From Swiss-Prot:
Cleavable signal peptide: 1-19
One Pfam family here: Rotamase
Lipidation (S-diacylglycerol cysteine): C20
Reported function: Plays a major role in protein secretion by helping the post-translocational extracellular folding of several secreted proteins.
InterPro entries associated with the record: Foldase_PrsA, PPIase_dom_sf, PPIase_PpiC, PrsA_foldase, Trigger_fact/SurA_dom_sf
Species of origin: Levilactobacillus brevis (strain ATCC 367 / BCRC 12310 / CIP 105137 / JCM 1170 / LMG 11437 / NCIMB 947 / NCTC 947)
Membrane-protein topology: Lipid-anchor
UniProt-annotated location(s): Cell membrane
Name of this chain's protein: Foldase protein PrsA
Protein family: Belongs to the PrsA family.
Length: 305
């Protein structure tokens, strides 16, 4: 996420390219620097060219997909990032040279690009089948984390003598008594729901959890870097079929494509060509040639994963 912040911070330069003219940007005892002089200097740099590329892309994306990205969608993503960083959110923004407003602007740009990918990428049956192999639907679990394996075994022994109807309440008591996870021990050990795409949980933990049916718990302690876990499955809808999860599988493939430079290049090329872009400054005529020259020969199809 921090890398993402830093990458977006560079886009803040976009404001410097707007409304260039004779107004003064800065003064010194050696003379003044006008907007036009600043523009002439900046446009010759790679950063300046990248900024103009982004400005153009934002314009055409907004025109083509603006009605598909709502204000609430931007706010939802913004709140997610804010929640991830908690009390350090403001400092991370500051270190990246961004404000809350500029972050929301770039979130919108990213969501617009995602709409373009969805519109220009064809997800094949083969890709759906491959994605389904590792797919697990969203599940809800509770866990008890302890530092010693013997303690976890004691908890499991207790659960074995517990009736199924009393399992959740007993697990809640044991979590409060034994768990070292302060964030969940007083909540019955319950974690936020997750699926196979979740990256916040230990892979060993997820693998053990996905094997459980609703109401089942791990028969042996699950060892991770944090200690030993006893996991109780609160709700597992089952894997089901590709047809049942086609929408979610497609979404996951599109999310993967958002990190695929080849797919993004081809999508941007199509979007720019459709945008009828015309560069008026002769010195910048070729800044989009890498995209526009390839748009007629490159097809935007989802990459094979």
């Amino acid at each position: 996420m921090k890398k993402w912040f830093i990458a977006l911070a560079g886009l803040l330069l976009t404001v410097t390219l707007a409304g260039c003219g004779s107004q003064t940007v800065a003064t010194t005892n050696g003379g003044k620097i006008t907007e036009s002089a600043y523009y002439s200097s900046l446009k010759g740099t790679s950063s300046g060219k990248q900024v103009l590329q982004q400005m153009i892309l934002n314009k055409v994306l907004e025109k083509q997909y603006g009605d598909k990205v709502s204000k609430s969608a931007v706010t939802k993503q913004f709140d997610k990032y804010k929640s991830q960083y908690g009390s350090s959110f403001s400092s991370v923004l500051s270190q990246s040279g961004m404000t809350q407003s500029s972050l929301k602007t770039e979130i919108r740009s990213n969501l617009l690009l995602k709409e373009a990918v969805k519109d220009n990428v064809t997800v094949t049956d083969a890709q759906l089948k491959k994605q389904f192999k590792s797919y697990e639907p969203e599940v809800s679990v509770a866990h008890i984390l302890v530092s010693k394996k013997s303690t976890a075994q004691t908890i499991i022994k207790d659960l074995k003598s517990t009736k199924s109807s009393d399992m959740t309440s007993e697990f809640t008591k044991l979590a409060k008594k034994y768990s070292t996870d302060t964030a969940t021990k007083n909540k019955g050990g319950k974690l936020s729901s997750f699926d196979s795409t979740d990256t916040s949980l230990d892979s060993t933990f997820k693998k053990a959890a996905f094997k459980l049916k609703t109401g089942e718990y791990t028969a042996t302690p699950v060892k991770t870097q944090y200690g030993y876990h006893v996991i109780l499955m609160l709700k597992n809808p089952g894997k089901g079929t590709i047809k049942e999860h086609k929408a979610e599988l497609t979404k996951q493939i599109i999310d993967n494509d958002m990190n695929d430079s080849t797919v993004l290049h081809n999508v941007v090329a199509k979007v720019l060509k459709k945008g009828n872009v015309s560069i008026k400054d002769n010195d910048l005529k070729n800044i989009l040639s890498d995209y526009l020259s390839s748009s007629s020969s490159s097809s935007a199809s989802s990459s094979s994963k």
